[in-house]
Amino acid sequence: MVEVAGVSPPEQTSAGLRTLVRQAALKRGPGMDRASALTNSLLDERYEVGKRLGEGGMSYVYLAKDVTNGETLAIKVLTPKLKEDKSSVERLRREAGLAMRLDHPNVCRILRLGETEDGLIYLVMPYLAGELLSDREVRQGALPLDLGVPLLVQMCRGLQHAHDLQIIHRDLKPENVMLVPDDKGPGGVRAVVMDFGLAKERRQEPEVAKLTATGIVLGTPEFMSPEQIRGKPLDPRSDVYALAIVAFEMFTGQLPFQGRNAQEMMIARLRGKPKLLREVKTDLPARLESVLGKAMALDPADRFASMQGFAEALEGAEESGVFAKLFRK
């Protein structure tokens, strides 16, 4: 691991701590249910299942190969406990329906929703060979401006595409962004926003709205907007807020809201007082601090109205940083 001046050692950064938790979960090994032990099996007489790539509260993710064409894929299988919950199954079906409409180089779409004869429900997605943004942050520390801003702009473009289709991500975090090799991309990579598992259409019919009205706040506490914490309706500005927190961590290795646990960080967000970017890294442009501050405004009305607006402001902030460096020279 490489230490970067002015940034905490990777294992002490917020991304590093989350990575340790994720790695510990994988080391626990498979549980007793079939969904957690599919490695080296043939799923639905079509997919050769390889190693387990990860797990979450709702699913297990595996590397797989489609035996009909040899394509390498990622398959997300719903946990048995949740598949017995009709609302969870409906949520997954909605996820597939929404994400199948996505078609953009900076988002990962879902190819197929399937169900085996014995009731395992799964999603088939392209396998992205690359590095999670969270792992890059652990390995390299804070990203330089000339890499971080272009990657954020790519994320904005992918999310704008989703928002144009009335889809809100609702769970943006570094663990849901893959950096895939791309000769034309900044630093030879391209950012792909993944896991629209909590995605939600903005304009819902009453019966659809009931599917997500479970009384449980969904999302990742460190990155949720104040309105998401309160269980209020979400719109593109909620994703703007979450992406701004992702950006803050990218450039500093720290989160803008502090607390001893997730609950305290959520309370801090409801009070609307994030750390200032340049309190953590003084060499970053003042304009970038202003842009992220606006994106993290407590009131959604004070944020950028769209990802397009956020992207344009980020590009302007990067230019201001370049000119400032030239002026200092």
Residue ranges, per PLM feature:
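C-terminal lobe helix-coil module of Hanks-type protein kinase domains
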Residues: 65, 160, 220-325
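AlphaC helix of the eukaryotic protein kinase fold
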Residues: 79-101
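Activation segment of protein kinases
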Residues: 83-86, 181-226
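A short, aromatic-enriched beta-strand patch in the conserved N-lobe beta-sheet
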Residues: 112-114
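Conserved short submotifs of the Hanks-type protein kinase catalytic core
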Residues: 118-132
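AlphaC helix of the protein kinase catalytic domain
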Residues: 133-143
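Activation segment signature within eukaryotic-like protein kinase domains
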Residues: 151-152
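Protein kinase catalytic-loop region centered on the HRD/HxD motif
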Residues: 156-167
